[in-house]
Amino acid sequence: MALPDFNIRQLLEAGVHFGHQTQRWNPRMAPYIYGDRNGIHIMDLTQTVPMLDQALQAVRDTVAKGGRVLFVGTKRQAQKPIAEAAERCAQYYMNHRWLGGTLTNWKTVSNSIGRLKSIDEAMEGGFEGLTKKERLGMERDQGKLQASLGGIREMGGVPDLIFVIDVKKEDLAIAEANKLGIPVVAVVDTNCSPDGVDYVIPGNDDAARAIALYCDLVARAALDGMSAQLGAAGVDLGALEEGGVEEALAEEAAAPAES
C-alpha cells in the first residue's frame, strides 16, 4: 500500500474549489483564494494539492506510530461519510454532536462509555430481573449514548490527531485539541479561519462529493499507516480495504510474542 494518489482534476470534479459568497469570506483565508466567479470565491487548488498531501502524510505517520485518529464531522452531510471512513480504517469518530469535554475531560466521557457498555451487556442478557419501565429507560439511555459515543467507545484514551470537516461548526473540538496539544487536520472553507489548525486543507466543506473525497483519502492514508505499523510483524494487510481490518488486528493480537 502507499499514500493515496489524487490530482487537481479529482478535486475539481468534487467541487473542492468552490468557496462561499465573497461577502461571507474570512480574510485569514485570502492566501488560499485564487479569485471569484459570479460572487463566489474560488480556491487556489495549486495550494490545496500539496497541503492536502501534507495532511495525509500526517495521518499516515500518526497511525504508523500506533497513534489514534479521531474523525469529527457532525453536520448532516458529513455524518455518514465520517463514520464510514473511520470504521473502514479502524479509527474513531464523532458524528452526532460534539460533547464539551470529550478530550479535556476524558475521565467523565470514559465513565459514560462504561455506562453504555454495561447497558449493552444487560441488553444481551435480556434485561434479566428488570421491570418494563427500567428496560425502557435503559433502552432510551442506550440510544442516546450510542449516538453520542458509539464512535469512540473503543478509543481507550484521547486521540493522537483529529481530522475535522467544518472548523466553524467544530470549533469546540478544535479548541479542546489545541488545549491538549493534539494536532488538528481540517478542511477550511473561505468563510472560516485557519487559526488553531496544524494541517490546513483549503477547500469546500459543504459539498457531499468533496466531503466524501476527503474522508476517502484520509481513510486510505490511515490504512497505509496501519500497513507500515503491522507489516513488519508479518500480518497480511492486503485485504484491509475489503473489510479485513479487525481480523488482521485480531491475528496480530493473538500471535505469540517472539522470544
Curated annotation (Swiss-Prot):
One of its GO terms (cellular component) is cytosolic small ribosomal subunit. Pfam families: Ribosomal_S2. One of its GO terms (molecular function) is structural constituent of ribosome. InterPro entries: Ribosomal_uS2, Ribosomal_uS2_bac/mit/plastid, Ribosomal_uS2_CS, Ribosomal_uS2_flav_dom_sf. The keyword Ribonucleoprotein applies. Keywords: Ribonucleoprotein, Ribosomal protein. One of its GO terms (biological process) is translation. The keyword Transferase does not apply. HAMAP family: Ribosomal_uS2_B. This is Small ribosomal subunit protein uS2. The gene is rpsB.
